[in-house]
From Swiss-Prot:
Catalysis: reaction(s): oxaloacetate + phosphate = phosphoenolpyruvate + hydrogencarbonate
Protein name: Phosphoenolpyruvate carboxylase
Cited InterPro entries: PEP_COase, PEP_COase_bac/pln-type, PEP_COase_Lys_AS, PEPCASE_His_AS, Pyrv/PenolPyrv_kinase-like_dom
Record gene name: ppc
EC number: 4.1.1.31
A UniProt-annotated Pfam family: PEPcase
Cofactors, names only: Mg(2+)
Length: 909
């Protein structure tokens, strides 16, 4: 029997009860805040929204004053937020329940290990699996940290309600706690008044580690190894999950990311993991009170105890406690020394710590702990070494002293400018940027192969750009020398279009010894983003990997070469189908090149939260990758509101990480459901379908003279761009140019206007054309849907996006257009939407959208009426703002509605 998605097991009755409790408390808090008269207007809107009478909703909202708009916006923005919490609690409860039973669900670790155990090389497979979620700070997390903390408190209260019998909880006290948090939310600024700095983004994402990610990852890693041992497989060195980080190192298009932010990111991360280790040692110190009156420690532990500064007479017979004290002193001294290297402030040094020697690395720290564990086991205290003790050992393997690996990223054009300046300064080439590709390659290879010296010198004049870039590489070298090799492992090149783009990056790394002619301490990782670049990636990588120097770099990295794939720009460039298909083909071709050259090509997937940016259910996203494309390792970006949704509490974090690992392993070992001949037939069909889709998409986006104005007039792009939700600018160029607009605000704006354009446009016409060409083609598409994971996932995502779109509301945004010619673009969009819905249901064999996703259907039924209200408030305020100059209250209301719609959709950018 096929395992079901865990979300489909949800307890709808309890969730509905909790939604009612929270809604009643919100009503009560709002009435006290605004009075009976104003509250009656809000409840009137609730009633109209539930009836789906959009015309009445629009007319009622148009009658509200600006001051009334604030209250209405706050109320309806808070409702979907509270619904989200109840659903998150339901998922967390279900995860906890099923992990303590024998019941199966899609992605459960036990089933995954059972599947692998049948293979002859099972131990090798499980030992090398490594899935890396990379946390990023793209501007899609619209919730303030303050609001997130309050919603987490409500989450905890609801968990209490579920974890104990309802009859045993103090209902009055419990309800008062919930009431208190909701009242505070209603009186707290829901949006940021100041734009975030990079330092804020670093600190914001760190909150997910102590209470969520660290316990979830250590638990999952321990469970992974335990399940393998039960099958007779030794995978003790496995790290199925490690974490990545872009914040502080991703300077592509963000002038605020500097050497200082890179240093700050590494330092804060290090502080977080040291704090965890110290707390864990304190816990062990308190609990492991084993006395020499009963058992004797090994000589190793006796020596650790002897070195301890814990000379209390009460600890005389407790060697383990004294040993833990010594380890904590060594750890404290180690952290002090690291902070001394990076901190500009004086570090307060404790005398006890100074007497203990510094750990040279995390492995040395682990060796001391393992000595204590061996002693306890020798004395038959095996139970003592489980739980927190084993969790600490797992944490050291996963997090070291660095916590997460920081990626560096820069645009290829910046690298070229810097290399051109370096070559000119070193009197090697005065006109590097004017050379053709072949000439560039020869100069770069000569420098990399033959001259170990840096091109720059300390006293040579440098542009501001080059100075800033060199400081970053210098800091990266310092971080690796201090915190270990894993703190920074790769440098990604945005807009990689040529071999020289990668060799230029190598030159920059060489300047501070991060790469030489024999090895690469930091790997050069190309990022292929546009449809054209994806199509060219095969030939670029084939030649790049043929260079002897590159082969040596790859060999120094364990024979792995990572390639990053960009989902956002390829979608904006060619539409959803063209993006998905070219990404799929690129992976297939690049994997084959790696196999030809004896290299394991691994992929980093630059996904966003929305389908238009590569988002969608994680399990399906990974299991729909081409067969053979996952070689042990896979990395994927997690950003914005997706981080909160997936990792906001330890149960949800465990489940989502478990899904990632299970999906990766499943794709590595499962067999294709359809024959290779069928896949080849499907591939040929897809080539033609995608060509049609790309043509339809580009005809509207790039060839229609009115599309540009439509986008800027019929979506809240200007309002979205002014949101204080990230440190990075919304556009590379002027905000009035589509070409310079970043993919994130592009997608975000279409989400707000409920068109969801990037997730489906061009799909309907392409499939319709294919079906009309041959009566048998519909059957082929249905076979593709049933037997090809890639195609099934693609259609399911389109189905989901269509269900979240709303053409009635989208048409109201179209009415914002200043002339009929511009507004006519909506007629094209609506016609394509209707066609896409019709064809998708035909291929799926369904009678309605979300027919095979009942949990999402119920979720949208809860929330859609409420954030429909927010859309009409947003529309009215945009109209008022464009007709007359309004005070700051206008922007505040708009931003509250943007926040609420994003919360309701749950994957807005």
């Amino acid at each position: 029997m096929t395992a079901k998605k865990l979300e489909n097991n949800s307890n709808h009755a309890v969730t509905a009860e909790e939604v009612k409790i929270l809604t009643d408390l919100l009503d009560e808090s709002t009435r006290h805040l605004v009075g009976d008269e104003e509250f009656a207007k809000i409840k009137g809107l609730v009633k109209i929204a539930a009836s789906s009478d959009h015309s009445q909703l629009e007319s009622q909202i148009a009658c509200l004053s600006n001051q009334e708009m604030i209250i209405v916006a706050r109320y309806f923005a808070t409702l979907p937020l509270l619904i989200n919490i109840t659903e998150d609690v339901d998922l967390a409860t279900e995860v906890n329940l099923l992990n303590n039973t024998d019941k199966d669900y899609l992605g459960k670790l036990e089933s995954t290990v059972d599947l692998v155990a049948e293979k002859d090389n099972a131990a090798e497979i499980l030992s090398h699996v490594n899935v890396v979620p990379v946390l990023t700070a793209h501007p899609t997390q619209v919730q303030r940290k303050t609001i997130l903390e309050l919603t987490n408190k409500i989450h905890d209260q609801l968990r209490r309600h579920r974890d104990v019998k309802a009859s045993t909880i103090n209902r009055k006290e419990w309800t008062n706690q919930l009431r208190r948090y909701i009242e505070i939310i209603m009186q707290t600024d829901i949006i940021r008044e100041k734009k975030l700095k990079v330092s804020n983004e670093i600190k914001n994402v760190m909150v997910y580690y102590p209470g969520s990610l660290i316990p979830a990852i250590t638990k999952l890693t321990a469970r992974y190894k335990e399940l393998a041992r039960e099958k007779g497989l030794n995978v003790d060195g496995a790290t199925p999950i490690t974490m990545g980080m872009w914040i502080g190192g991703d300077r592509d298009g963000n002038p605020y990311v500097t050497a200082e932010t890179l240093r700050l990111s590494a330092t804060i991360q290090s502080e977080v993991i040291f704090e965890y280790y110290v707390k864990a040692l304190n816990d062990l110190y308190r609990t492991v009170s084993v006395s020499t009156s009963y058992v004797q420690p090994t000589p190793e532990v006796a020596e650790l105890a002897k070195l301890s500064a814990d000379n209390s007479p009460f600890r005389e017979n407790e060697p383990y406690r004294r040993a833990f004290y010594y380890l904590e002193s060594r750890l404290a001294h180690t952290e002090m020394e690291l902070l001394d290297v990076f901190s500009k402030e004086a570090v307060v040094k404790k005398e006890a710590a100074l007497k203990a020697p510094v750990y040279k690395d995390a492995y040395e720290f682990k060796k001391d702990l393992e000595a204590i564990k061996r002693s306890l086991i020798q004395n038959h205290d095996r139970a003592v070494t489980g739980g927190h003790f084993d969790a600490l050992l797992e944490a050291i393997d996963v997090f070291g002293f660095h916590l997460a690996t920081i990626d560096m990223r820069q645009d290829s054009s910046v690298n070229e400018a810097c290399v051109a300046e370096l070559l000119k300064s070193a009197r090697i080439c005065d006109n590097y940027s004017d050379l053709d590709e072949e000439e560039k390659i020869q100069i770069l290879l000569s420098e990399l192969n033959n001259d170990p010296r840096s091109l720059h010198s300390s006293n040579s004049p440098k542009s501001e750009l080059l100075q800033r870039e060199l400081k970053i590489y210098h800091t990266a070298r310092l971080l690796k020398d201090t915190l270990g090799e894993n703190v920074i492992k790769q440098h990604i090149i945005s807009h990689t279009e040529s071999i020289s783009d990668m060799l230029e990056q190598a030159i920059m790394l060489k300047e501070y010894g991060l790469l030489d002619s024999e090895k690469a301490r930091v790997q050069v990782v190309p990022l292929f983003e546009t449809v054209e670049d994806l199509q060219n990636s095969r030939e670029i990588m084939k030649r790049y990997l043929s260079f002897d120097i590159v082969k040596r770099w790859v060999a120094s990295k364990g024979n792995y070469q990572e390639i990053m794939l960009g989902y956002s720009d390829s979608n904006k460039d060619g539409g959803y189908l063209a993006s998905c298909w070219n990404l799929y083909k690129a992976q297939t071709e690049l994997t084959a090149i790696g196999e030809e050259q004896g290299i394991k090509i691994t992929f980093m997937h630059g996904r966003g939260g929305t389908v238009g940016r590569g988002g969608g259910p994680s399990y399906e996203a990974i299991t729909s990758q081409p067969f053979g494309s996952i070689k042990d390792r896979i990395r994927t970006t997690e950003q914005g509101e997706i981080i909160q949704n997936k990792y906001g509490n330890k149960d949800a974090a465990y489940y989502n990480l478990e899904m990632l690992v299970s999906a990766a392993v499943d794709r590595m070992v499962s067999k294709q459901k359809v024959s290779q001949d069928h896949i080849q037939d499907f591939t040929a069909s897809m080539d033609g379908i995608v060509e049609d889709s790309n043509r339809v998409y580009r005809e509207l986006v790039f060839d229609n003279p009115h599309f540009h104005d439509y986008f800027f007039q019929a979506t809240p792009i200007k309002e979205v761009s002014s949101l204080n939700i990230g440190s990075r600018p919304a556009a590379r160029k002027k905000i009035t140019e589509l070409s310079g607009l970043r993919a994130i605000p592009w997608v975000f704006s279409w989400s707000q206007s409920r068109v969801m354009f990037p997730g489906w446009y061009g799909v309907g016409s392409a499939f319709k054309h294919f079906i009309d060409a041959d009566p048998n083609n519909l059957k082929e598409l249905q076979e593709m849907y049933q037997g090809w994971p890639f195609f099934h996932s693609l259609l399911s995502n389109v189905d989901m996006v269509l269900s979240k779109s709303n053409m009635e509301i989208a048409e109201k945004y179209a009415d914002l257009c200043e002339d009929e010619a511009t507004r006519s673009v909506f007629d094209i969009i609506k016609k394509e939407w209707e066609l896409t819905k019709e064809v998708i249901l035909q291929i799926e064999g369904h009678s309605k959208l979300l027919e095979d996703n009942p949990s999402l259907e119920r979720s949208l039924d809860y929330r859609l009426p409420y954030f429909n209200v927010l859309n009409y408030v947003q529309l009215e305020m945009i109209k008022r703002g464009r007709q007359e100059k309004l005070s700051g209250i206008y922007e505040s209301i708009i931003h509250i509605t943007i926040n609420g719609v994003a919360s309701g959709l749950r994957n807005s950018g």
